[in-house]
């Protein structure tokens, strides 16, 4: 009888060095690390959601095609329902893109940017080709065009507004890349509600364009994991081949649809976030030695005179959690989500303490 079992020996060799993704959980801190909506969920919309789901039979599987939600999204985006695909968060859709078009191939991506593209690419055995951003974190359009045209590159990715830098890429520049390549061009617009111009008007002209969106940021549904994708039907037909059956549960579908029917309170919250973003940027920039970068998202990237790890640890000790993004192109940088006025005030106060200067 065989008694020795080694799971690691059976796992894919190319994944042995991959570290599981872990999000820190500190329930007793001011949480400014995940770019969440700080104002919580509008009570009146929550009441509408609970009323909607109260009549549902949870013993039945959800609508696999999420038809009613796609109809609601069509009204919001101006895109036909057949050109919309929903997922269990945008993460699932990113992985589906990599599995469908990238396995055994390469993808080009403007860096620094959202780290999950690299992780999902690796899971799908799709090699990453990094295209460093220019000064001010602008996309190097000519370099992206060259990378997208390299042998084996089947996907090109641009996040706008970009996480973690906060800057947006004009649609005109993305159109230059679309014109130059037959590869899939993924435009991640997770933060579109906070700034920048959308590439949705380009969809009808470029069959290789894919746009990703999420309910996690502007619409305060991070806990329910709802993302969606806009693309031509031929692209979606291919993506559906790898989609998990019943990938978006009935509660999440209903909640997202109710959100689309009740946009005014979310727009008010977005307005408050934008106002706080400007105030936070001004106060960060006023701290000696701190460089804050302009943002069109719901977070701000900043560079400190101290090592980022020390600043991160010092803030955490004082009850404030931010994101340490120190790395290539982001030396001594951290990212802070725009919180409520009180959260932002506390963050500035504690950052001043960590840096040894009065805030």
From Swiss-Prot:
InterPro entries: Aminotrans_II_pyridoxalP_BS (IPR001917), Aminotransferase_I/II_large (IPR004839), HisP_aminotrans (IPR005861), PyrdxlP-dep_Trfase (IPR015424), PyrdxlP-dep_Trfase_major (IPR015421), PyrdxlP-dep_Trfase_small (IPR015422). Keywords: Amino-acid biosynthesis, Aminotransferase, Histidine biosynthesis, Pyridoxal phosphate, Transferase. Pathway: Amino-acid biosynthesis; L-histidine biosynthesis; L-histidine from 5-phospho-alpha-D-ribose 1-diphosphate: step 7/9. PROSITE patterns: AA_TRANSFER_CLASS_2. Transmembrane segments: none annotated. The modification N6-(pyridoxal phosphate)lysine is found at residue 217. Signal peptide: none annotated. Its cofactor is pyridoxal 5'-phosphate. GO terms for biological process: L-histidine biosynthetic process. It catalyses: L-histidinol phosphate + 2-oxoglutarate = 3-(imidazol-4-yl)-2-oxopropyl phosphate + L-glutamate. One of its GO terms (molecular function) is histidinol-phosphate transaminase activity. CDD domains: AAT_like. Its EC number is 2.6.1.9. Pfam families: Aminotran_1_2. NCBIfam families: hisC. Homodimer. HAMAP family: HisC_aminotrans_2. This is Histidinol-phosphate aminotransferase. It comes from Pelotomaculum thermopropionicum (strain DSM 13744 / JCM 10971 / SI).
